[in-house]
């Protein structure tokens, strides 16, 4: 487990260079960090991460490409897997022996490089964003929930097109994201929200009302299951039935959600003061992440999927506190402390990773 902590120390050290490096040097640091993380995630063995063995099973269940194209619609619907995974797995299976390693490495390249590119494009504090990405997102989405990890990369890259009102590029990237993970479909609503101003009262209610409904045990998922949304309805019904069988409980005030509530509240009050043109839309996405968590809490898998999908904007949002908190050193310390809390939450509380090892 020591290697995880050494990596965290490395990225904290890198973040301390935020004000000391030129933009070109920062771009080089981001590139090298991306390569390091791709190798770290892509070369891991099946003993690292809770989902690796699940992906081995899914990979073995996928038909070869010749069979897949015979009845594509039936295959997608019956498998309940996204088309991208079916296509990639079937292609790799047809061309590589022990192809699961190739598949995992490919997802690492895609998921990590897309997020590094998004940091380069969106963040004003790139090295601090890199630290938040490593401690709060990398382990969960690029070493565990890898399909969602790639989808998130495309969604983050779509955010500039919300500001530009470029619907073609936004919905093109959204479509690709959905092909990697169906939960990404919910991101489409953010194209239509006001990205210049934030109504503080409305967004406070967006945070508070779902919490009240959750405490009153209103089952929003059961209501949605009464409507027909194609394969999305199938997913919701499957998760709802699974919840009834498993009787699993959800901690509605877990660390990640509480932190996002605090961050969202801070930026509801301060987003318009930020110099960053993405601050308002990032704040709204963060607020909806909390709202969906509580609205969908009757089906924990869906609640966490949507929350984790939308909470990835914290990569950009948390470092923006540097613009708003004085003196600046306190804000930088705040970002590092938050990253430490994220990291320890992944390592000690979630406990989904064993000691690191490679497959060779």
Language-model features and meaning:
Residues 24, 116-135:
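Transmembrane-helix signature of polytopic, membrane-embedded enzymes
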Residues 53-56, 63, 86, 191-304, ...:
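Alpha-helical transmembrane segments and terminal signal-anchor/GPI-anchor hydrophobic tails
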Residues 53-61, 68, 73-97:
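Short hydrophobic/aromatic helix or loop-helix immediately within or flanking a transmembrane segment
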Residues 105-121:
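Transmembrane-helix motifs of polytopic, lipid-linked glycan transferases
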Residues 127-145, 149-156, 183:
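Membrane-embedded helix bundles of polyisoprenyl
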Residues 138, 169-193, 294:
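Membrane-interface alpha helices of multi-pass inner-membrane proteins
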Residues 143-150, 155, 180, 268-325:
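Membrane-water interface signatures at transmembrane helix termini and the short loops
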Residues 155-169:
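Membrane-interface transmembrane helices that cradle and orient dolichyl/undecaprenyl
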């Amino acid at each position: 487990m020591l290697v995880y902590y050494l990596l965290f120390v490395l990225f904290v050290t890198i973040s301390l260079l935020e004000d000391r490096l030129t933009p070109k040097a920062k771009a080089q640091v981001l590139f090298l960090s991306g390569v390091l993380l791709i190798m770290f995630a892509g070369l891991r063995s099946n003993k690292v991460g809770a989902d690796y063995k699940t992906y081995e099973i899914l990979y073995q269940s996928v038909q070869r490409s010749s069979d897949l194209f015979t009845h594509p619609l039936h295959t997608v619907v019956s498998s309940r897997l996204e088309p991208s995974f079916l296509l990639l797995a079937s292609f790799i299976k047809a061309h590589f022996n022990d192809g699961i390693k190739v598949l995992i490495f490919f997802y690492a390249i895609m998921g990590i490089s897309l997020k590094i590119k998004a940091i380069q494009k969106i963040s004003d504090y790139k090295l601090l964003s890199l630290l938040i990405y490593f401690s709060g997102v990398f382990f969960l989405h690029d070493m565990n929930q890898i399909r969602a990890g790639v989808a998130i990369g495309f969604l983050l890259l779509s955010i500039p097109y919300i500001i530009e009102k470029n619907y073609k590029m936004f919905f093109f990237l959204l479509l690709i994201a959905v092909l990697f993970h169906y939960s990404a479909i919910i991101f489409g609503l953010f194209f239509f929200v006001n990205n210049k101003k934030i109504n503080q009262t409305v967004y406070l209610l967006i945070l508070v009302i779902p919490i009240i409904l959750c405490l009153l045990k209103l089952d929003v998922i059961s209501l949605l299951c009464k409507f027909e949304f194609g394969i999305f309805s199938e997913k919701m019904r499957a998760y709802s039935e699974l919840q009834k069988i498993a009787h699993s409980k959800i901690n509605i005030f877990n660390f990640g959600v509480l932190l996002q509530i605090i961050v969202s509240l801070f930026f509801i009050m301060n987003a318009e003061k930020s110099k960053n043109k993405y601050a308002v839309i990032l704040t709204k996405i963060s607020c909806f992440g909390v709202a969906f968590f509580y609205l969908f809490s009757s089906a924990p898998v869906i609640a966490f999927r949507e929350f984790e999908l939308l909470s990835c904007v914290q990569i950009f949002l948390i470092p923006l506190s540097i613009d708003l908190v004085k003196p600046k050193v306190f804000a930088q310390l705040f970002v590092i402390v938050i990253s430490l809390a994220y990291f320890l939450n992944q390592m000690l509380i979630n406990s989904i990773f064993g000691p690191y090892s490679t497959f060779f």
